[in-house]
């Protein structure tokens, strides 16, 4: 069977969120670059993959998927379902909770920081420090909750690695490309959790993928 195709750009933390899940699941896939400069993401061919004209999109045979966290769940269900713990109702529920927390709390606070520090200058803009500072305060409040949670268990959903943990990888790697990575220093259990994730071959591969070429 042909490898799955993941369409997008490695500079997109939504694409590398998918890549992390695909790597951890041991999926056979390839990244197919999309040229934003030529508006390829708005082309008729790409709109078949993602009708919103965005990335990422995943093709697996005749199946097309979009939305990064849905792609991550598909990768887990197909090749490593234990990442979702669907055989245990309570554990699966906690995985779902922390997947939602990642999207609606952690990444919601981190996204504006990453955009202001990493993306805006690339687009010829400037960094709005007020936005950065406001969202750093939001992120600290989120990290307080994470710290409390990780004093009770090794991973977010329990004492087992799950997709909930892996979904944090891409944006946290981006955080370390900013001057604000030290925000984690005040949360020792969060730092230990992150260090453990960084030891995983899947995470190391995605980290290498995200590094700019020399």
UniProtKB/Swiss-Prot annotation:
Annotated keywords: Transferase
Tissue: Expressed in the stem and leaves, lower levels are seen in the pollen and endosperm.
Domain GST C-terminal: 88-214
Keyword Transferase: yes
PROSITE patterns: GST_CTER, GST_NTER
GO CC term (a single one): cytoplasm
GO terms classed as biological process: glutathione metabolic process; response to herbicide; response to hydrogen peroxide; response to reactive oxygen species; response to salicylic acid; response to xenobiotic stimulus
Catalytic activities: RX + glutathione = an S-substituted glutathione + a halide anion + H(+)
Residues covered by the GST N-terminal domain: 2-83
Subunit structure comment from the entry: Homodimer or heterodimer of GST-I and GST-IV (=GST-II).
Family assignment from sequence similarity: Belongs to the GST superfamily. Phi family.
Protein name: Glutathione S-transferase 1
Encoding gene, per UniProt annotation: GST1
């Amino acid at each position: 069977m042909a490898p799955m195709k993941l369409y997008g750009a490695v500079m997109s933390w939504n694409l590398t969120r998918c890549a992390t899940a695909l790597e951890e699941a041991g999926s056979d896939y390839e990244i197919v670059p999309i040229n934003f400069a030529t508006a390829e993401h708005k082309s008729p061919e790409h709109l078949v993959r993602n009708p919103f004209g965005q990335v990422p999109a995943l093709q697996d045979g005749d199946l097309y998927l979009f939305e990064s966290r849905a792609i991550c769940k598909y990768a887990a269900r197909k090749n490593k379902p234990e990442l979702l713990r669907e055989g245990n109702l309570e554990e699966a529920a906690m995985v779902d909770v922390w997947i939602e927390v990642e999207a609606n709390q952690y990444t919601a606070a981190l996204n504006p920081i990453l955009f202001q520090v990493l993306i805006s200058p690339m687009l010829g803009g400037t960094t709005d420090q007020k936005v950065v500072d406001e969202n750093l305060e939001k992120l600290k409040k989120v990290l307080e909750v994470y710290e409390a949670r990780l004093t009770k268990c090794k991973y977010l959903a329990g004492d087992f690695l799950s997709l909930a943990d892996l979904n944090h990888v891409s944006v946290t790697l981006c955080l370390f490309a900013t001057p604000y990575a030290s925000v984690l220093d005040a949360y020792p259990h969060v730092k230990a959790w992150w260090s453990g994730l960084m030891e995983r071959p899947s995470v190391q591969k995605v980290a290498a993928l995200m590094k700019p070429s020399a």
